[in-house]
């Protein structure tokens, strides 16, 4: 079997799908994207495609090493996202050829279900509370929400109080009947993170995500030393080498590699194993589409330390398409009591509605994240 063609489809809301075709008619799907940089990743995919056409798709490990090591300059969000989507598609092909789900090819199940959590948006506490009530009705009891809006490098007590007030009202409304993580989104400087984390501790959030930017990872162990709240990070780390430094330094309790950013299934399985050796748990980052989610689920079901799975159903970014709009076998992604079951169809287990993908790709938006500014007109972290 040989790879004959690679096609990319930019799609709403901010996704990109990839299709790898073979000379025997077996097709694999992947999801390579950096949100807001889809065209750049698309160019990288097709550059890497020069290494792949005519090659045997079953040699996943070798092809991964070729894509990573054949270029003198390597790594980073663009190239690793391109590799990630290609890697997903190669695993999809292998599973289809062998008539087996990917998790079976990786040694079989380590659990029977994985807890999912849902993002809850809203600018005011009442909106967040209403959103949680709706999601609880369909089985969710674990959520993630913004921990704050933009904060100055050194900000005032009013800004801190506003962030804490939202969390306080949520905990008061639901008590210990729900769990929620708070996403700082890298918006908070190290000095302000110390202040905000201390103020949030009484409300017992499940975790605090990206308390500072990944570029400031040296602060993770320092922040962890002052709090009992687990710290989470990883969506802006792109290889096992990035994660190695964080694991060695300590401070992070929950790693959040993104299966569409950090080298795909092949690389993230290695990252999961590294994390387990440090007694660090895994909760793959996934505010993306169904192929990315499927890849995450296969890692969840073969990684002992996987504890939570993010998913984008109903997320505020999903304008123009919802999580399962391009999926034929929607029922396989059904959650029971807030848990996903293993996908059982061969490969990644996602049956893509290709005609719909082609149609929607004709008018795909070029999504960009907002540009925020502080009161003094300097650029703020989004």
Swiss-Prot record:
Reaction proceeds via an anti dehydration. This is D-galactonate dehydratase 1. Its EC number is 4.2.1.6. Keywords: Lyase, Magnesium, Metal-binding. The lineage of its organism: Bacteria, Pseudomonadati, Pseudomonadota, Gammaproteobacteria, Enterobacterales. It comes from Escherichia coli (strain SMS-3-5 / SECEC). PANTHER family: D-GALACTONATE DEHYDRATASE, D-GALACTONATE DEHYDRATASE-RELATED. One of its GO terms (molecular function) is magnesium ion binding. The keyword RNA-binding does not apply. Belongs to the mandelate racemase/muconate lactonizing enzyme family. GalD subfamily. Binds 1 Mg(2+) ion per subunit. The keyword 4Fe-4S does not apply. Catalyzes the dehydration of D-galactonate to 2-keto-3-deoxy-D-galactonate. Its cofactor is Mg(2+).
